C-alpha cells in the first residue's frame, strides 16, 4: 500500500515542472490539493516520497542535459538517414534496429505517415542491439544502410524498404540479396567511421535514458515502443499545431 501511495504521489508531482510555466487549470489545482491531502493523511510516506522526487528531479536534469548535448548529433543528416522530406520542419527522431520486429512495424508506420505528410522528416538513429556482427560480412544491416545513405541516397528508400520487409534477423544471405536487388553491392564493405557512428548512437541512446528499441522523439515528447498509425497521427497533428501557434 505504501509503495502504491508513493507511486501515485510521484506520478502526480511529476507534472509540477510543466505546471510551473503556466496558470493552473481547475483540474490541476484539484490535483495539487490532492497531493497535499494525500501527504497529510499518510505522513509515513513523506520521507520515501522526498527521496523519490529528488531522484526524479536528478533524472530529469540529466535527461535535459543529454538532449542538449546530443541535439546536433541526432540532427546530422549527413550521418543519419532520413525517411520523408529531408527539409521538413516536423522532425521525428527514430531510434531503430533492422533486427527488431517492433522497429520494423514502426518503420512502416513512419514511412506511411511521411508519404501522407509532406512536412514530415524522420531521422533514423540506428542502434543495432540485436546484431553487431554478421558472419561472412564486413558489415551489418545498420552499417550497410548508412553507407548507402551517405554514398547513394537515391537508392536508400528501396534498400530501407527491403531491409524492413524481412522478418527475423538479417544474415549474410539476406543482406547480399538486398544489395544485389538494389545495385548497392559496393557498399557491403566495412567502414570505420560508420562503425564509430553506431557506437556513438548507442552511447547517446543510453545517455537519453532509453532501454529498448523502437523509441521516438517528437518535440519534447518521448514515445518508447511501438505506436500505431492513428495514435502517432494524433501526436504529429498536435505537434504541428503547436509549431504554428
For the regions a language model picked out, list residue spans one by one.
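Bacterial N-terminal signal peptides that target proteins for export
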Residues: 1-8
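N-terminal targeting signals for export/organelle localization
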Residues: 10, 14, 18-72
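C-terminal cap of thioredoxin/glutaredoxin-like
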Residues: 23-28, 33-37, 178-245
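Extracytoplasmic/secreted proteins, especially bacterial periplasmic and envelope-associated proteins
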Residues: 30, 34, 41-48, 105, ...
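A short beta-strand-turn-helix
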Residues: 73-90
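Structural alpha/beta surface segment adjacent to cysteine/selenocysteine redox centers
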Residues: 93, 104-180, 206-211
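Aromatic-flanked redox-active Cys/Sec active sites in thiol-based oxidoreductases
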Residues: 94-100
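The canonical Cys-X-X-Cys-His
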Residues: 100-106, 216-217
Amino acid at each position: 500500500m505504501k509503495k502504491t501511495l508513493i507511486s501515485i504521489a510521484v506520478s502526480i508531482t511529476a507534472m509540477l515542472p510543466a505546471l510551473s510555466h503556466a496558470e493552473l487549470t481547475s483540474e490541476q489545482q484539484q490535483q495539487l490539493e490532492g497531493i497535499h491531502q494525500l501527504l497529510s493523511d499518510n505522513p509515513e510516506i513523506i520521507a520515501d516520497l522526498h527521496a523519490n522526487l529528488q531522484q526524479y528531479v536528478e533524472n530529469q536534469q540529466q535527461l535535459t542535459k543529454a538532449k542538449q548535448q546530443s541535439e546536433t548529433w541526432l540532427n546530422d543528416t549527413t550521418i543519419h538517414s532520413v525517411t520523408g522530406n529531408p527539409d521538413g520542419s516536423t522532425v521525428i527522431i527514430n531510434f531503430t534496429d533492422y533486427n527488431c520486429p517492433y522497429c520494423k512495424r514502426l518503420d512502416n508506420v513512419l514511412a506511411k505517415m511521411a508519404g501522407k505528410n509532406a512536412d514530415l522528416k524522420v531521422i533514423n538513429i540506428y542502434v543495432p542491439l540485436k546484431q553487431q556482427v554478421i558472419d561472412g560480412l564486413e558489415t551489418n544491416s545498420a552499417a550497410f544502410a548508412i553507407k548507402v545513405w551517405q554514398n547513394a541516397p537515391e537508392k536508400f528508400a528501396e534498400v530501407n524498404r527491403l531491409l524492413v520487409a524481412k522478418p527475423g534477423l538479417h544474415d549474410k544471405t539476406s543482406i547480399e540479396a538486398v544489395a544485389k536487388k538494389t545495385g548497392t553491392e559496393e557498399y557491403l564493405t566495412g567502414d570505420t567511421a560508420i562503425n564509430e557512428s553506431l557506437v556513438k548512437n548507442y552511447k547517446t541512446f543510453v545517455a537519453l535514458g532509453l532501454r529498448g528499441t523502437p523509441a521516438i522523439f517528437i518535440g519534447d515528447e518521448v514515445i518508447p515502443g511501438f505506436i500505431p498509425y492513428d495514435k502517432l497521427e494524433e501526436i504529429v497533428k498536435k505537434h504541428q499545431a503547436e509549431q504554428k501557434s
